[in-house]
From Swiss-Prot:
It catalyses: L-lysyl-[protein] + 3 S-adenosyl-L-methionine = N(6),N(6),N(6)-trimethyl-L-lysyl-[protein] + 3 S-adenosyl-L-homocysteine + 3 H(+). S-adenosyl-L-methionine binds at residues 112, 140, 162, 213. It comes from Deinococcus geothermalis (strain DSM 11300 / CIP 105573 / AG-3a). One of its GO terms (molecular function) is protein-lysine N-methyltransferase activity. This is Ribosomal protein L11 methyltransferase. Methylates ribosomal protein L11. One of its GO terms (cellular component) is cytoplasm. The lineage of its organism: Bacteria, Thermotogati, Deinococcota, Deinococci, Deinococcales. Keywords: Cytoplasm, Methyltransferase, S-adenosyl-L-methionine, Transferase. Its EC number is 2.1.1.-. Its main location: cytoplasm.
């Protein structure tokens, strides 16, 4: 069995995980401060993940071990689970089924859980035009988990956008697994501010909620676009922020006129919520 040992944890090397999947990894797990990436054959890896080493190890059922370590993740009114744990969702919770795979976002990372909790705290079903359900924009959608969570929580329409084309079919498949019709959740490759992300003919010219699980420097860059895509007073949910980077995010939101800025901390990670300018 061919295993690539990469120093670090799934948290500290979060930005590199998609590089391993794209290089052909068939599974990832973390043991003792080392990420173990399983491959069928040795392959050339990008520079960002070249600080590890290849090892031949005795065969084992790593997939069974990987499944054994995954547990349901409760986030507000939603419980995120892989397909084989769906029956473990508690009564009264909304099951959100995500197949672990190439796109980041299975709910086990604090940033994903914080964002779903923030969505759960909003009354999405009563927002939007005439109270028919919020219009939600998920920036950097990955597996689609946040857009799907929004739909499960009552959003009338959710759009998940990502610059990585690999994620889009995965997100669509996850929406289908969860029984969310394409009329309520869509996924598209695109960049906020560079591509049209509204559907005026369908009443989606702005959004009631924008949620983005990115990183602080991108939030700083996109703060103006967040404001432009939100209705006056709309809800902004930002995560993927290291606590040491919070001043950068606060400064960006202040610059763009956001109000009611609040933060939630979980270890080294932070979530920031705010309200868009009223005009």
């Amino acid at each position: 069995m061919l295993v690539y040992h990469l120093p670090g944890t799934l948290d500290t090397r979060e930005a590199d995980l998609d590089l391993l999947w794209a290089a052909g990894a068939t599974g990832l797990e973390e043991r003792g401060g080392v990420i173990r990436a399983y491959f069928d054959t040795r392959t050339e890896l990008p520079p960002q993940v070249s600080d590890g080493e290849w090892r031949e190890e005795a065969d084992q059922d790593w997939l069974a071990e990987f499944k054994r370590t995954l547990r349901p993740v409760r986030a507000g009114r939603v419980t995120i689970v892989p397909p084989w744990l769906r029956e473990e969702v508690e009564a009264g919770q909304l099951p959100l089924v995500i197949e672990p795979g190439m796109a980041f976002g299975t709910g086990h990372h604090a940033t994903t859980r914080l964002a779903v909790e923030a969505l759960s705290a909003l009354n999405l079903a009563t927002l939007g035009p005439r109270g028919t359900g919020a219009r939600v924009l998920d920036v950097g959608t990955g597996s689609g988990v946040l857009a799907i969570a929004a739909a499960l929580l009552g959003a009338g329409f959710a759009l998940g956008v990502d610059i990585d084309p690999i994620t889009i079919p995965i997100a669509r498949e996850n929406a289908q697994i969860n029984g969310i019709p394409a009329s309520r959740v869509r996924f598209a490759e695109g960049t906020l501010g560079a591509d049209p992300l509204t559907f005026p003919d369908e009443g989606v010219d702005t959004y009631d909620v924008v949620v983005a699980n990115l990183y602080a420097e991108l939030h700083d860059l996109l703060a103006g676009e967040y404001a432009a895509h939100l209705v006056p007073g709309g809800a902004l949910i930002l995560t993927g922020i290291l606590t040491v980077k919070l001043p950068l995010v606060h400064a960006a939101l202040d610059r763009e006129g956001f109000t009611n800025v609040q933060e939630t901390l979980d270890g080294e990670w932070a979530l920031v919520t705010a309200r868009a300018p009223l005009g």
